[in-house]
């Protein structure tokens, strides 16, 4: 197959219909279309309003703790014996992950639109916590849909949401994971369109969500680009991030897309291997289809039914991916690779012991790719890994898998 011709810029999408090439769009129930268009209009107005930008910037700085640091992971780099590895420390944000970046932007949008009720979906629980956090900060009721499987996997985060005043609704349909939680949230939205704002946590869903989530998360890459120029005097050779729905990854990637010298790698959940169905590598092993309002790469069976998938990481077990990632895969700009559960677990422990940093299992997938790549690169090469969240939420899962009683 011929490699596609590179566009003049990889940063111009989506078009006005929300398409990134053949991906994206607005495949929603008729009742939702007016709301989607209202949201798009509100976002267009807000993004061009200096007051909105100033308020978001102030909250990001004084509430969330931005900018997050770009940290030279010296212990890990020396252990691997190749490229210098830097961590973009999104784990240091308020609430412990990158999710707060998007939630602050969207809660300000909800306020502008006069919405009085917030709903959200969550897998790893980090988006649920961040949504409950911003709802508490602005005095709005918040309902968080969580797959029943994930309620069990993420007990500390479920308790945090409740502490913050959110109502947590377990979803037992399907496998009781992120896809099912998103289905329930969409059902809620359809029946409560007047007063409800759906605060989507990932760069998927109907347009304008993939675009606005990307824009709110792009602060990650914008900062990282500036920080690496200050610390190394040049751009990195490689940037790496884990991809579930893909918001932390697109946030890091987007500001680097037109830097041709920078190799970009997205890391999918390879689960127990791509041979069967126990993985969530939709771009490595899926094909295009429509889910949750957009056309993108999905895990499907021969009849087009969406597969449940599996990952040790609750935040990566989504059977699809944001449409911009699908386009970046097909355009050849970004390489997407799978990492197995056991590789992520090994990286989780290695990072903890060489750096004194406990990463989220999602981030551990990206670190596992760094473990593979860094030793093949020269010591003069530079890599940035997005440390998308901290791993406190995962210690019970990891303990169980390692046979330790916590």
From Swiss-Prot:
Record-listed N6-(pyridoxal phosphate)lysine modification sites: 99
InterPro entries given in the database record: Trp_synth_b_CS, Trp_synth_beta, Trp_synth_beta/beta-like, TrpB-like_PALP, TrpB-like_PALP_sf
UniProt KW Methyltransferase keyword: no
Record key words, sorted: Amino-acid biosynthesis, Aromatic amino acid biosynthesis, Lyase, Pyridoxal phosphate, Tryptophan biosynthesis
Pathway: Amino-acid biosynthesis; L-tryptophan biosynthesis; L-tryptophan from chorismate: step 5/5
The keyword Amino-acid biosynthesis belongs to this UniProt entry's keyword annotation: yes
Catalyzed reactions: (1S,2R)-1-C-(indol-3-yl)glycerol 3-phosphate + L-serine = D-glyceraldehyde 3-phosphate + L-tryptophan + H2O
Pfam families listed in its UniProt record: PALP (PF00291)
Single GO MF annotation: tryptophan synthase activity
EC numbers, comma separated: 4.2.1.20
Enzyme class: lyase
PROSITE patterns: TRP_SYNTHASE_BETA
Essential cofactor(s): pyridoxal 5'-phosphate
Disulfide bonds: none
Membrane-spanning residues: none
Gene Ontology cellular component list: cytoplasm
Self-association and partners: Tetramer of two alpha and two beta chains.
Family stated for the protein in its record: Belongs to the TrpB family.
Role, per record: The beta subunit is responsible for the synthesis of L-tryptophan from indole and L-serine.
Name of the protein this chain belongs to: Tryptophan synthase beta chain
């Amino acid at each position: 197959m011929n490699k596609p011709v590179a566009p003049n810029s990889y940063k111009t999408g989506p078009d006005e219909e929300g398409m990134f090439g053949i991906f994206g769009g607005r495949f929603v129930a008729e009742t939702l279309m007016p709301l989607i268009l209202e949201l798009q209009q509100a976002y267009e107005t807000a993004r061009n309003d200096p007051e909105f930008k100033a308020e978001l910037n102030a909250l990001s700085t004084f509430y969330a703790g931005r900018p997050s640091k770009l940290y030279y992971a010296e212990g890990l780099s020396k252990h691997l014996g190749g490229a210098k590895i830097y961590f973009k420390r999104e784990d240091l944000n308020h609430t412990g992950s990158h999710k707060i970046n998007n939630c602050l932007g969207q809660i300000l949008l909800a306020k502008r639109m006069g919405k009085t009720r917030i709903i959200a979906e969550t897998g790893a629980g980090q988006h649920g916590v961040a949504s409950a956090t911003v709802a508490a900060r602005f005095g709005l009721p918040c309902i968080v849909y969580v797959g029943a499987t994930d309620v069990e996997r993420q007990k500390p985060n479920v308790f945090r949401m409740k502490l913050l005043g959110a109502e947590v609704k377990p979803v037992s349909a399907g496998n009781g994971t992120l896809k099912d939680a998103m289905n329930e949230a969409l059902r809620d939205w359809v029946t409560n369109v007047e007063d409800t704002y759906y605060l989507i946590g990932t760069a998927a869903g109907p347009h304008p969500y993939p675009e606005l989530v990307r824009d709110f998360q792009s602060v990650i890459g914008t900062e990282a680009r500036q920080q690496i120029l200050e610390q190394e005097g040049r751009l990195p050779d490689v940037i790496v991030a884990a991809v579930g729905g893909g918001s932390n990854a697109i946030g890091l990637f987007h500001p680097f897309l037109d830097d041709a010298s920078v190799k970009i790698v997205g890391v999918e959940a390879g689960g127990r291997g791509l041979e069967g169905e126990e993985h969530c590598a939709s771009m490595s092993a899926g094909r295009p289809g429509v889910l949750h309002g957009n056309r993108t790469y999905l895990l499907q069976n021969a009849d087009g039914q969406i597969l449940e998938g599996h990952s040790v990481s609750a935040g990566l077990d989504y059977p699809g991916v944001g449409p911009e990632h699908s386009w970046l895969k097909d355009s050849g700009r970004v390489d997407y690779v799978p990492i197995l559960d056991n590789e992520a677990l090994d990286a989780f422990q290695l990072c903890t012991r060489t750096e004194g940093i406990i990463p989220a299992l999602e981030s551990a997938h990206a670190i596992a790719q760094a473990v593979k790549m860094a030793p093949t690169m020269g010591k003069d090469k530079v890599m940035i890994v997005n440390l998308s969240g901290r791993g406190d939420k995962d210690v019970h899962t990891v303990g169980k898998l390692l046979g330790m009683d916590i």
